[in-house]
Design a protein with these regions (language model features):
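Gly/Ser/Thr-rich active-site cleft segment
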Residues: 18-20, 129-236, 240
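Carbohydrate-associated surface elements
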Residues: 114
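Active-site neighborhood of divalent metal-dependent phosphoester bond hydrolases
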Residues: 123-129
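N-terminal glycine/serine-rich phosphate-binding loop of ATP-dependent small-molecule kinases
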Residues: 1-107, 122, 154, 210-217
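Solvent-exposed alpha-helix faces
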Residues: 67, 240-241
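Gly/Ser-rich phosphate-binding catalytic loop and adjacent alpha/beta segment
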Residues: 117
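Short, charged, surface-exposed secondary-structure boundary motifs
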Residues: 47-49, 120-123, 185, 229
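Acidic, His- and aromatic-enriched active-site or binding-groove loops in soluble protein domains
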Residues: 110
């Protein structure tokens, strides 16, 4: 089977990584050989004491990265992908994206680069007997609770950048177990149940009404097939229009 036939028969596999300074897309075939690639440069910004990327940065960046990949495929093989055998998203891990019940982002995305959660990280680490770095999502959530931030009362769910993109593409609030390990401690194939119970009590004692297993994204094993694309990424402008 030629590369063109593999592309047309969805025998290729797409990976997209949201790095700190570049969004990268790589297409491989069923022998793991690289087929095509694309990229989009971006930068975080420091706003109101927080390192962040806007939702427009995220959406536009993904569009342009994917358009760059599609253009590379077309220029090399004369075809345009209409689907893939599988795909995966990665995105710097950690960080904090908090949403209300209508999926509105409540505060600007807080990236892994922020070091504003030391009190929360220290208290959680002592409570659980497990090191919780400042960049983890649970540290950001608990710090927001400790700070008495206005948005906390409206939180329906939180996510990482990769988890957010996964939700946008599939409608599923799920992350792989590797991604989950930067949200909250994992044990086997899910969040550590003992730690969840302890953290839930701590949060409730501080006035947080949510339950972590309802607020955090679900956890999937590596290779699990639990979601499909509801669209072919986003409508993709030409990278020349960026």
């Amino acid at each position: 089977m030629t590369i063109q036939e593999k592309i047309q028969n969805k025998k290729t596999y797409l990976g997209i990584e949201f790095g700190s300074t570049r969004i990268k897309a790589v297409l491989i075939d069923d022998t793991f050989a690289p087929v095509a690639s694309g990229s989009h440069d971006w930068q975080n910004r420091y706003e109101n004491g927080v390192w962040t990327y806007s939702l427009d940065d995220i959406t536009t960046g993904l569009q342009h990265c994917y358009a760059s990949l599609a253009e590379d495929v077309k220029s090399k093989y004369g075809v345009v992908p209409t689907g893939y055998g599988a795909m995966g998203i990665s995105g710097m891990m950690h960080g904090y994206m908090a949403f209300d019940k209508d999926d509105n982002l409540l505060v600007p995305f807080r990236t892994w680069r922020n070091t504003i959660t030391e009190p929360a990280a220290s208290e959680l680490s002592e409570l659980l007997g497990f090191n919780i770095p400042q960049r983890w999502s649970i540290a950001h959530l608990y710090q927001a609770v400790l700070n008495g931030e206005e948005h906390v009362k409206d939180i329906a769910h939180i996510n990482t950048l990769a988890g957010f993109i996964h939700y946008q593409l599939t409608g599923k609030r799920q992350v792989g177990v590797g991604e989950a390990s930067g949200i909250f401690p994992v044990d086997g194939i899910g969040y550590n149940a003992e730690y969840i119970a302890k953290a839930d009590k701590l949060l409730a004692d501080k006035g947080f009404s949510g339950k972590l297993l309802e607020v955090l994204p679900g956890v999937l094993n590596a290779g699990a097939r639990e979601a499909v694309l509801t669209c072919l990424l986003y409508t993709s402008p030409s990278p020349r229009d960026a």
